[in-house]
């Protein structure tokens, strides 16, 4: 049984696709798989801007072999893909599994491959890098929102006003957030009280951005990061509609 989540975020200055098996959030601490194994693959040509078709095929074969042949000795927990680098992450009980992984990698000389391992008793790569925080989780919702706007005929590249609704446990927390909003590049909006909600103290803030996914992700991440220390959360996005002609 798996529970894969895919989201887009930035990695080393590039747009990246992250995949993480969410089931291991609870399972990793009770397993004895504390040896991280990671396999990085890139085009042989260091100046290449992307994987060519042959390299894409060879990487798929590499991925399938690693997952199939390491089964029972290692668990595949996630991956990060950019145009020029693809990395697979595993956890194993024994560091010796790296030898088996390295042997598999040697069969794929058409790719530039690095195969390495590290002891991670606290599963840092999974919890701090692969598993999404609130800002990264929001990127999934952002992608859905952007697609809905695209289907309606909106010009996604045009900058427009975007209004965010954030919710807090108390009026005091909301006030503290709104006090610092201008420093974040947002304009404070209205406030409301939703008594039936677990976070009843609500407010809106607005700013300007396009609806490209990287831009909207950075926009919402600023608000989420500022609200998080006050136990606030982003609950709604409302972007002005700009028609595509």
What are these regions (language model features)?
Residues 1-245:
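Long, contiguous binding/interaction regions
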């Amino acid at each position: 049984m798996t529970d894969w989540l895919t989201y887009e975020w930035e990695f080393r200055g590039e747009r990246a696709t992250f995949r993480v098996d969410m089931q291991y959030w609870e399972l990793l601490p009770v397993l004895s798989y504390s040896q991280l194994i990671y396999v990085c693959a890139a085009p042989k040509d260091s100046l290449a801007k992307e994987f060519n078709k042959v390299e894409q095929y060879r990487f798929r074969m590499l991925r399938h072999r690693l997952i199939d042949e390491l089964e029972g000795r290692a668990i595949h927990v996630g991956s990060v893909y950019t145009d020029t680098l693809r990395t697979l992450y595993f956890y194993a009980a024994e560091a010796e599994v790296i030898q088996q992984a390295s042997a598999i990698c040697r069969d794929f000389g058409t790719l530039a491959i690095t195969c390495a391992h590290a002891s991670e008793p606290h599963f840092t790569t999974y919890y701090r890098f692969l598993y999404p925080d609130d800002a990264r989780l929001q990127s999934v919702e952002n992608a859905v929102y952007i697609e809905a706007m695209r289907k309606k005929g909106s010009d996604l590249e045009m900058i427009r006003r975007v209004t965010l609704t954030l919710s807090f446990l108390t009026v005091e927390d909301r006030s503290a957030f709104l006090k610092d909003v201008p420093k974040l590049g947002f304009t404070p909006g209205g406030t409301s009280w939703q008594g039936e909600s677990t976070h009843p103290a609500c407010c809106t803030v607005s700013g300007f951005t396009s609806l490209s996914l990287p831009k909207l992700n950075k926009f919402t991440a600023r608000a989420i990061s500022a609200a998080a220390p006050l136990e606030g959360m982003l609950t709604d996005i409302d972007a002005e509609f700009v028609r595509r002609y």
